[in-house]
Design a protein with these regions (language model features):
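Basic side chains
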Residues: 6, 29, 46, 122-123, ...
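Phosphate-binding site recognition
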Residues: 9, 15, 46, 51-54, ...
Length: 176
């Protein structure tokens, strides 16, 4: 269910396993995809400011979904960018909780650009694809990023490593 997103005032759909969205220009096809992305990722893929996608004269956009297993997800974004997230009617405070329930991947022309850019962009895309396949990957990825950041900080701020710093470096390397 989508309320007040661009040209979608009040829309309710019941998608099946595989769906094709068709319609004339300006009928809301992209807005529907944007609503799904907003629920999953907490942001629009078109604009960073909610006031740009919330319908005029409305205080907020709301997207609500019931997943196949009965789990309910909801997001409300207000014009001041404040956000309310709900999982099974309980307020949650971390977008990643909804993302784990409804992982999405936007494939558009910029996705193809990622493949031609540097290795960091490609790694980011691969990390996101792995997250889709194995959602337990996310906590491991967060821990890995933290270890890598600490290890690299040690290397960056130390020209000649002392014995203690070498031991610290070995522990970071072991964790990686």
């Amino acid at each position: 269910q989508v309320s007040h997103l661009r040209n979608l005032s009040e829309v309710s759909i019941k998608p099946t396993a595989c769906n094709v969205v068709i319609g004339v220009n300006g009928s809301g096809k992209t807005s529907l995809l944007e609503a799904i992305f907003l629920l999953s990722r907490g942001k629009s893929f078109r604009h960073s400011q909610p006031k740009r996608y919330i319908q005029h004269h409305n205080p907020a956009v709301t997207v609500h979904a019931i997943l196949a297993d009965g789990t309910t997800l909801a997001i409300q974004k207000q014009t001041d960018a404040s956000t309310i997230l709900r999982l099974n009617q309980t307020t949650v405070y971390n977008q990643s909780i909804l993302t784990e329930q409804l992982p999405t991947l936007l494939i558009d022309p910029s996705t193809m650009d990622m493949l031609e850019q540097g290795s960091a962009s490609r790694r980011q895309l691969l990390d996101w694809l792995v997250f889709h396949m194995k959602q337990s990957f996310h906590p491991q990825w967060v821990a890995y990023q933290r270890l890598l950041k600490q290890r690299n900080s040690l290397l960056k701020h130390s020209k000649n490593l002392s014995r203690v710093q070498l031991a610290e470096l070995k522990s970071w390397d072991k964790g990686l």
